[in-house]
Amino acid sequence: MAMASDFYLRYYVGHKGKFGHEFLEFEFRPDGKLRYANNSNYKNDVMIRKEAYVHKSVMEELKRIIDDSEITKEDDALWPPPDRVGRQELEIVIGDEHISFTTSKIGSLIDVNQSKDPEGLRVFYYLVQDLKCLVFSLIGLHFKIKPI
C-alpha cells in the first residue's frame, strides 16, 4: 500500500442549467481531510459545505476500494465527453500513479452499455457509486452525532 502522503482523491459531477451551476464535489487529502460540497439552487437551496478528518483506517479502506476496482488500468479516451447534460471528473493519486478521468454524466447502466468502452466505463460507474456511498455515509454520520 502507498504511504498516506502519496494519496489524493477528488470527484466532481455537475452541470450548468436553469438553476445555475449545480454540482457535487468531494476530495480526500493526504492528511485525511475530507472536503464535501453540494450545490443545488433548486427551490433556492443553498450550498452545503462540510469538512471533516477521517481516520487512517478509512483512508486505507479508500485505497483498497480503488485498488480492487482496477480503475488505474482504464483509459477515458473512448468514454462519452462532457456535454450539456453535465460532466464527471475523477482524479486519483495513489503511490506513484496519478490518473484523471473526465466523462459525461451517466444516468444508468444503459448509458454505460451503449458507450464505446462499456467495460472501462462500468469500472468507473461502480467505483463512483461506491465512493459516493462512502462519502455520504461519512458526512451523514459525522454531522448527525450530537456530542454529550
UniProtKB/Swiss-Prot annotation:
N-acetylalanine PTM sites in chain numbering: 2
Name the UniProt record assigns to this protein: Protein mago nashi homolog 2
Top-rank lineage group of the source organism: Eukaryota
Function per UniProt: Required for pre-mRNA splicing as component of the spliceosome. Plays a redundant role with MAGOH in the exon junction complex and in the nonsense-mediated decay (NMD) pathway.
Signal peptide: none
Record note on quaternary structure: Component of the pre-catalytic, catalytic and post-catalytic spliceosome complexes. Heterodimer with RBM8A. Core component of the mRNA splicing-dependent exon junction complex (EJC); the core complex contains CASC3, EIF4A3, MAGOH or MAGOHB, and RBM8A.
Entry-linked InterPro entries: Mago_nashi (IPR004023), Mago_nashi_sf (IPR036605)
Species this chain originates from: Bos taurus (Bovine)
Cell compartments where the protein resides: Nucleus
GO annotation terms (biological process): mRNA splicing, via spliceosome; mRNA transport; RNA splicing
GO cellular component: catalytic step 2 spliceosome; exon-exon junction complex; nucleus; U2-type catalytic step 1 spliceosome; U2-type precatalytic spliceosome
Family label: Belongs to the mago nashi family.
One GO MF term attached to the UniProt entry: RNA binding
Keywords, alphabetical: Acetylation, mRNA processing, mRNA splicing, mRNA transport, Nucleus, RNA-binding, Spliceosome, Transport
